[in-house]
């Protein structure tokens, strides 16, 4: 009888080595044409805007995008998710200061960085944690996409309900040369559907924040 493998219990010992490999190696995966088309569909609007840009990556049904747009009324908020099914459930507000886009952020981050986008803030809220140790390279900081995430810059905010993910995210940022702060969330108003669900069932919630425009750690 096969028993399910338990979640990873602590940060990987070789995390810094993996990060160094990603940051020093070119990602050879070609950008998909549908991703390029999705990027071009919003490129002009973003370039024409004088408002600070906030990116809400993997936004799900877009609740977080709408809430961020309400919290930052002077910004242009761009919510991105690859799932047509999830985005179809979004309750749009035609007068809001945000855009919703279906795209794969693996490609979108690279295209945005290559185009010179400079988001003021970037939110990555409750990404799939892939908790098994064998799934490490599927986590954002364990994948080649982490380099593009870093290249975009801006004030990065990541939230998760898994403490190991938060710990590893801090370690990954440190390995890349960036300072970060981590904290447990207690009284914050939920801004995503997942955050509401996790809070209602009593999960511990964690936040990691890093200013990717400030390289503050000496590289060895």
Model-derived segments and spans:
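S-adenosyl-L-methionine
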Residues: 1-53, 63-67, 92-116
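Conserved beta-strand/loop positions that form the S-adenosyl-L-methionine
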Residues: 57, 80
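Class I SAM-dependent methyltransferase "Motif I" SAM/SAH-binding loop
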Residues: 58-62
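Conserved SAM/SAH-binding beta-strand->alpha-helix loop
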Residues: 83
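Charged helix-capping and loop-helix junction motifs
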Residues: 137-145
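Conserved beta-strand signature within the Rossmann-like core of class I S-adenosyl-L-methionine
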Residues: 152-160
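Class I S-adenosyl-L-methionine
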Residues: 165-172, 176-220
């Amino acid at each position: 009888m096969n028993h399910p493998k338990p979640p990873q219990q602590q940060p990987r010992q070789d995390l810094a080595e993996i990060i160094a490999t990603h940051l020093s190696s070119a990602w050879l995966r070609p950008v998909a044409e549908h991703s390029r088309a999705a990027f071009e569909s919003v490129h002009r609007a973003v370039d024409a805007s004088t408002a600070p840009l906030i990116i809400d990556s993997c936004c799900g049904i877009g609740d977080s995008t709408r809430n961020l747009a309400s919290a930052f009324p002077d910004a242009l908020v761009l919510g991105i998710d690859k799932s047509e099914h999830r985005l179809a459930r979004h309750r749009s507000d035609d007068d809001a200061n945000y855009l919703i886009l279906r795209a794969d952020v693996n490609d979108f981050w690279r295209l945005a960085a290559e185009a010179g986008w400079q988001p003021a803030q970037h939110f990555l809220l409750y990404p799939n944690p892939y908790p098994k140790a064998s799934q490490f390279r599927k986590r954002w900081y364990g994948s080649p996409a982490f380099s593009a995430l870093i290249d975009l810059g801006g004030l990065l905010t990541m939230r998760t309900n898994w403490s190991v993910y938060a710990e590893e995210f801090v370690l990954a940022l440190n390995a890349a040369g960036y300072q970060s702060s981590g904290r447990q969330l207690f009284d914050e108003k939920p801004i995503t559907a997942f955050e509401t669900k996790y809070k209602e069932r009593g999960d511990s919630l964690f936040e990691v924040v890093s200013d990717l425009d400030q390289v503050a750690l000496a590289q060895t």
